[in-house]
Amino acid sequence: MQSLSLNSSTLQSPSMALVLIRPETETTGPSTSSRALQEVIAQLAQELTHNGQLDESSPLGKLLGKAMAASGKAGGGLEDIKAALDTLIHEKLGDNFGASADNASDTGQHDLMTQVLNGLAKSMLNDLLTKQDDGTRFSEDDMPMLKKIAEFMDDNPAQFPKPDSGSWVNELKEDNFLDGDETAQFRSALDIIGQQLGSQQNAAGGLAGDSSGGGLGSPVSNTENSPGSLGDPLIDANTGPASNSNSNGDVGQLIGELIDRGLQSVLAGGGLGTPVSTANTALVPGGEQPNQDLGQLLGGLLQKGLEATLQDAGQTGTGVQSSTAQVALLLVNMLLQSTKNQAAA
């Protein structure tokens, strides 16, 4: 019996060893993304982090929050946010996305950020509508993006005839259901905008300053007398004053170029409009105004920059084309913009 006991103990030892080893083999290893993509992910993670945790007030923040909750990482810190972003980008944009970016210059790094933002915006369009009975339903969480798409449809009635409610914006307010015909119209708009975002993703070189590059930002970068980008203040206003933003971040440069363009438009006599001009007068030395006023001011400059961009784009495209370019720019900008400041802008 003693010999049997010894043999049993011996047989159990390898089994116990396997139990101890298994957690190590199942532990997630370091990111396999290219160094350039990891830098982009780090910048985005900083923009999405508030007080050490994920800020879910933006569309991208909400999407990432759901992904982290599904993987048991809800409430995680910066490293968890980076890991979740890494996974999300490869799920949406492909396993090999960004693989060749390490050999790119600073311009290529900037282009990679643009590709990520356009690609994520495009992928989010695919998830806005969920099939239900003979139509589709949508979530209230996606209303900021849905509203911009509905406004695009209302601006192009020849392409998208008005529904019974009188406008597509009103249609979204009635309930969260679209019937078969309404779904077909909405999906048509999503396809058009998705194609624009795809084109911008593929032609991401436009942000580097080559006005012939096309895609997102090319009209904005064609500002030879521009004093330079204003950087990240708009993102600070969007994600919160305590946000850990990167002063040289590509997202800040993208939005900064639009703000620069808006400022040039205002100086040329374009005006900011009543709500923003109220905030503008508050920036007198010694005056104190809440952060919301700053968000409204910068949001107004951003809007003016978009309008100026479209005015330039109108020389090569009109109607639905220029309108599509506008809504695509807005959707990309909204990815990191908090819901509160979307309303202010």
From Swiss-Prot:
Keywords: Host cell membrane, Host membrane, Hypersensitive response elicitation, Ion channel, Ion transport, Membrane, Repeat, Secreted, Transport, Virulence. Coiled coil: none annotated. It holds the Pfam family Harpin. Residues 206-217 have a biased composition (Gly residues). GO terms for cellular component: extracellular region; host cell plasma membrane; membrane. Residues 213-275 are annotated as: 2 X 7 AA repeats of G-G-G-L-G-[ST]-P. It comes from the Bacteria. GO terms for biological process: monoatomic ion transmembrane transport; symbiont-mediated perturbation of host programmed cell death. Transmembrane segments: none annotated. Residues 219-228 have a biased composition (Polar residues). Sequence repeats lie at residues 213-219, 269-275. The keyword Secreted applies. NCBIfam families: T3SSHrpZ. Belongs to the harpin HrpZ family. Harpins are proteins able to elicit hypersensitive response (HR) in non-host plants and are required for pathogenicity in host plants. HrpZ forms ion-conducting pores permeable for cations. Such pore-forming activity may allow nutrient release and/or delivery of virulence factors during bacterial colonization of host plants. This is Harpin HrpZ. It comes from Pseudomonas savastanoi pv. glycinea (Pseudomonas syringae pv. glycinea). The gene is hrpZ.
